[in-house]
C-alpha cells in the first residue's frame, strides 16, 4: 500500500490495520467497519466537486454520501470506462456498512473491509494523479 498523501485517510487506514491485529470480538471488528466507512467518506470528500461532478440521479450528495460522491466523481473522470469501477467502489462502501452493523462480525469480515477500503483509496488516488 502506498500512502495517499491524504493525512486523514492514511491515518485511518493505519488505525484499521492496528485494530485488526488486536481485535478479538465482534464489537472490535465492527469498529473497524466504522472506521472504514468514515475513511470512504473522507476519500469521496477529497475528490468530489459538486460543480464538476453532477450526481447520476440528480439528487444532491450530502457531505457523508460516499456512494453518490464516488459514483459522480468516477463517472466524470473515467467516462465510458466507469461502470465496473463504480460498482467496485460502491461495493466497498456496502462492505464497510455491513461490517459496522454486523453483530456477528468476524476477523475475516474486518480483513475484507480493510482490503476493500485500502484498494479504493489507492484506486481513487491513482485516478486523481493520472487525470484524463
Predicted segments — roles?
Residues 26, 49-50, 106, 127:
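Generic macromolecular interface patches on structured domains
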Residues 19-23, 38, 42-53:
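Short hydrophobic alpha-helical module
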Residues 58-131:
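Long, charged low-complexity segments
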Residues 8-11, 19, 37, 68, ...:
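Arginine residue identity/basic-tract feature
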Residues 2, 30, 45-46, 98, ...:
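Residue-identity detector for glutamine
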Residues 1-29, 132:
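Charged alpha-helical initiation segments
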Residues 27-33, 45-63:
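Short acidic alpha-helical/loop segments enriched in Asp/Glu that coordinate divalent cations
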Residues 8-15, 35, 42, 88-95, ...:
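Amphipathic, well-ordered alpha-helical segments in soluble domains
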Amino acid at each position: 500500500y502506498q500512502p495517499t498523501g491524504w493525512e486523514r485517510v492514511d491515518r485511518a487506514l493505519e488505525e484499521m490495520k492496528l485494530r485488526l491485529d488486536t481485535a478479538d470480538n465482534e464489537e472490535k471488528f465492527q469498529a473497524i467497519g466504522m472506521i472504514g466507512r468514515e475513511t470512504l467518506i473522507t476519500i469521496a470528500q477529497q475528490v468530489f466537486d459538486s460543480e464538476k461532478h453532477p450526481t447520476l440521479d440528480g439528487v444532491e450528495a450530502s457531505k457523508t454520501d460516499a456512494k453518490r460522491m464516488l459514483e459522480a466523481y468516477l463517472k466524470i473522470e473515467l467516462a465510458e470506462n466507469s461502470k465496473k469501477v463504480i460498482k467496485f467502489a460502491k461495493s466497498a462502501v456496502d462492505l464497510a456498512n455491513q461490517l459496522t452493523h454486523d453483530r456477528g462480525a468476524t476477523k475475516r469480515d474486518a480483513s475484507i473491509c480493510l482490503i476493500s477500503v485500502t484498494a479504493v483509496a489507492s484506486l481513487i488516488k491513482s485516478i486523481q494523479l493520472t487525470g484524463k
